[in-house]
Amino acid sequence: MAEVEERILRIKQHRGVIGLLIVDENGKVLRTTMNKQDKEQNPIQIAKKVTELAKKARSVVRDIDPQNDLTFFRVRGRNKQEIMVAPDKNLYLIVLQRTDFDEN
């Protein structure tokens, strides 16, 4: 468990990271660094939508090559945010990150 905590802390310390979610295959939030009461970036809604997208992306990868599997994907929106997803067999690691931070 300490190893998981260390990794979460390390990810959170990256520049621009808004939040991190660990989600099960049904979109249930198991762990988050985000405020569950946030109406604009509600982690429960993010988890549901991103797991749906990840399942579709995994299906596309497998349709193209049945021997292959989705290991990571990133989506960048116009709002200068990225959603990065690392799917595993039963879990998804989702990281939200701002991309508009100052480069200096």
Model region roles, listed by residue range:
Residues M1-N104:
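Non-catalytic interaction/Regulatory regions outside core domains
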